[in-house]
Amino acid sequence: GDHDLEERMMLRVEVQRKAGGGVPEVVAHALNEAVVERRATDGEAGGQTVRVGVTLDGESFTSYAADGLIAATPTGSTAYAFSARGPIVDPLHRAIQLTPVSPHMLFDRTLVLDPSTEVGMEVLGRRAAICTVDGRPVADLAGGDRVVCTAAERVARLVTFGPRDLRGLLVNRFGLADR
């Protein structure tokens, strides 16, 4: 039939424990995103944020006070990252998108990074956090634990039918023709 094969970028996601010396305890792959977000514990009031220190290629960038921090692929730019007000990135593009979720700070913008960038997200303080990959919990996180995201060597291969039309997809998905 009339079909195409699209290759989509994926993320390699490593969870590194504070006491583990940088050795990954969990390795996963994400088509959409990896998220470090706050996790409520018994007896804890809601509404608190998690503090996440970010490194880019091993260099300190900033720390976020937010409900979470999303590292997304272009495919994931229309998933959770979109809900957090991140930009829509053409899914055939290669980039890593870093989007804060409900940040409590002046710098609240998404970064669109080169796919060769290593993004490190370290839980700061004692606030409980969790790492999810494509919506599935992969690890509870404590202070000093890190999640490291890089472009995966492997790609996702998706079969598509008919011509590729990003404009038409966006118009239909988000009701833009009604304007």
Residues of each region from the PLM?
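ATP/nucleoside-binding phosphotransfer catalytic cores, i.e., glycine-rich phosphate-binding loops
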Residues: 18, 23, 36, 41, ...
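Residue-level signal for pocket-adjacent positions within structured domains
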Residues: 29, 56, 77, 83-84, ...
